[in-house]
Amino acid sequence: MNRPERLQPGVKLRDADKVSRIPVKIVPSERDTMLRKPDWLRVKLPASNQRILEIKQALRKNGLHSVCEEASCPNLAECFNHGTATFMILGAICTRRCPFCDVAHGRPLKPDAEEPVKLAQTIRDMKLKYVVITSVDRDDLRDGGAQHFADCIREIRKLNPDIKIETLVPDFRGRIDAALDILSTEPPDVFNHNLETAPMHYRKARPGANYQWSLDLLKRFKERHPNVPTKSGLMMGLGETNDEIAQVLRDLRAHKVEMLTLGQYLQPSKFHLPVERYVPPAEFDELKALADELGFTHAACGPLVRSSYHADLQAQGKEVK
């Protein structure tokens, strides 16, 4: 049997090259079998791209990455035009191969020791008041990247004392306690970790992840920092039922999670998991009502909602759809 070719550091694998390395075989979608995108998912392009270009130039100048670009988020134009961005630290190559995600897979380079300072300076220059910091999975690092998160938060606050920081962290597989010890030295203002989907779909959608680990990460952080809101996000359209999603919401509340985002999965390419259905806005409204009933302090539920979409407004408890 042929072994997979050893990956070279810094080489990005995308699409077929990426998903060919997961345990569940994905048959590339043919155009005539792909579901037609409904009108409620049409995104209006901005009248001007000037602000988008300014933010992209600032990121390139400092060698930084935004998950908005790397994950092909449909809200990039809207968020960039509002002067907000979700920064992705620890490089743009992920050690996982989730077939719903458009971020590249491969062997990452060593963390950039200068990134925390460059990130803080960029945020200051962009005059941001609320930032989201996320990362790729770094299973190659002993702490999963936790120290780099803490370093970034510390440097950001040095130059931006009034800023609010939300972290969207990976699952720190096999090293939760060690990671939480480090993160506790520089806790964020909002702690976010996405469950992504219902547990029965993890094998196909989140190979290498574990539903209970993710719940435990959220709960253990909350036990250490009871005054910091915890948050999680889910996608719909991967074959789950509304009842399955409802149970995930109950599980999140049982693990003391207070904030929720729920949006529609969109297939990045024909080599990724197909969209099994487009969920109508009315069904998102029903799940929003359930989330409110269960006691979430804020639930953003709608087709175009993403974990970081208007995160500043979400943190203020304002309605986001």
From Swiss-Prot:
InterPro entries: Aldolase_TIM, Elp3/MiaA/NifB-like_rSAM, Lipoyl_synth, rSAM. GO terms for molecular function: 4 iron, 4 sulfur cluster binding; lipoate synthase activity; metal ion binding. SMART domains: Elp3. [4Fe-4S] cluster 1 binds at C68, C73, C79, S308. One of its GO terms (cellular component) is cytoplasm. CDD domains: Radical_SAM. Disulfide bonds: none annotated. Keywords: 4Fe-4S, Cytoplasm, Iron, Iron-sulfur, Metal-binding, S-adenosyl-L-methionine, Transferase. It comes from the Bacteria. It is found in: Cytoplasm. PANTHER family: LIPOYL SYNTHASE, LIPOYL SYNTHASE, MITOCHONDRIAL. HAMAP family: Lipoyl_synth. Belongs to the radical SAM superfamily. Lipoyl synthase family. This is Lipoyl synthase. It comes from Shewanella baltica (strain OS185).
